[in-house]
Amino acid sequence: MHEVWKMEKIKELTEDQLKEITKEGRTVLEFSADWCPDCKFLAPFMPEIEKDFSDAKFYEIDRDGSIDIAKKLIIMGIPSFVVYQDGKEIGRLVNKDRKTKDEVENFLRSLD
């Protein structure tokens, strides 16, 4: 039996949820939206990225449904990634450019 790698999707992320899901260990938040073509481009690679970085918890955050948190975290473009370690932000890949699998993996590796 093989493992299925599928990050949890959160439609509306609240401040309390953000604190809860990021308080322990490494947490990767991917901000995206259903209408976003660059998010759809990256989506097929996310299970493999998640498997390669299995020490982290991955969450897909709907940027439109979580607009208050997105504004607070200054998420200007999607897809964007914000990484936490034990409740503290340790890195971000936030811009409006299309991201490739290699770019995301290199970014995540750079945080170790």
Task: Give the location of each predicted region.
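Chalcogenol-based redox active-site neighborhoods
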Residues: 2-5, 72-73, 98-99
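Non-catalytic, surface beta->alpha helical segment in thiol-disulfide oxidoreductase systems
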Residues: 85-112
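Short hydrophobic/charged patches on amphipathic alpha-helices used for structural packing
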Residues: 18-19, 67-70
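Short pre-active-site segment immediately N-terminal to redox-active cysteine/selenocysteine motifs
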Residues: 25, 32-35, 77
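N-terminal leader/targeting and pre-domain segments
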Residues: 2-27, 103-112
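Structural micro-motif
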Residues: 73-82
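Conserved redox-active cysteine motifs that mediate thiol-disulfide chemistry
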Residues: 31-44
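Thiol-based oxidoreductase modules, predominantly thioredoxin-like and allied folds used
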Residues: 11-12, 31, 46-50, 54-68
